[in-house]
């Protein structure tokens, strides 16, 4: 059985775009619990980001070495929150981790369909762009001051201005 921990009070949350699809297609029985209620999580659980109690629930499952699924926004190809349709977005789903730790050998067409061109790094730009993760991710990684630490480290190697782009 899969147990989804979801925001019950916000059925318009993008998390439900994932969870509704999972409920329809998961090969086993699916139960949904409110992620605002502190509880002891069940093995084989699914979460969307680190909202509400999800961070604590994931940490408990990791400590016990129990299976969980972590879903969140993709690494690239953001979506339009005002125009979500079944065919115009995708999500990130990781098993027992919050990020993919390896890249499976897939055909190139899976990437090419996004129409993105990978550019070489520009080491001669006029500024350095820092794109920090959310506070929840930094807390999970035990790096609450990641942004400040990263900027301090960059300043050791360049005098170019540093610009921040927070998560949209």
Listing of model-derived features with the role each one plays in the protein:
Residues 1-3, 126-127, 161:
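Residues that mark the start of a beta-strand
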Residues 63-68:
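A short helix->loop->beta-strand "cap" motif at the edges of active sites that frequently abuts
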Residues 71-143:
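A nucleotide-sugar donor-handling region in carbohydrate enzymes
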Residues 48, 70-73, 165:
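Generic beta-sheet signal
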Residues 56-61, 153:
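A short acidic, amphipathic alpha-helical/loop segment
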Residues 53-58, 147:
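Short, well-ordered alpha-helical microsegments
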Residues 1-55, 136-137:
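N-terminal pre-catalytic "stem/leader" segment of glycosyltransferase-like enzymes
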Residues 6-10, 131, 147-168:
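Catalytic donor nucleotide-activated moiety binding site of glycosyltransferases and closely related
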């Amino acid at each position: 059985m899969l147990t989804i921990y979801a925001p019950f009070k916000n059925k318009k949350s993008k998390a439900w775009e994932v969870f509704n699809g999972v409920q329809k297609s998961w090969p086993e029985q699916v139960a949904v619990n409110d992620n605002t209620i502190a509880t002891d999580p069940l093995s084989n659980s699914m979460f969307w980001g680190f909202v509400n109690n999800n961070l604590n629930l994931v940490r408990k499952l990791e400590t016990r070495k129990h299976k969980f699924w972590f879903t969140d926004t993709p690494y690239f190809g953001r979506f339009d929150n005002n125009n979500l349709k079944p065919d115009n977005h995708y999500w990130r789903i990781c098993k027992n981790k919050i990020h993919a730790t390896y890249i499976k050998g897939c055909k190139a067409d899976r990437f090419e369909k996004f129409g993105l061109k990978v550019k070489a790094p520009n080491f001669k730009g006029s500024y350095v762009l820092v794109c920090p993760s959310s506070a929840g991710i930094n807390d999970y990684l035990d790096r609450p001051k990641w942004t400040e630490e990263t900027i301090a480290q960059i300043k050791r190697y360049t005098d170019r201005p540093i610009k921040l782009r927070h998560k949209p």
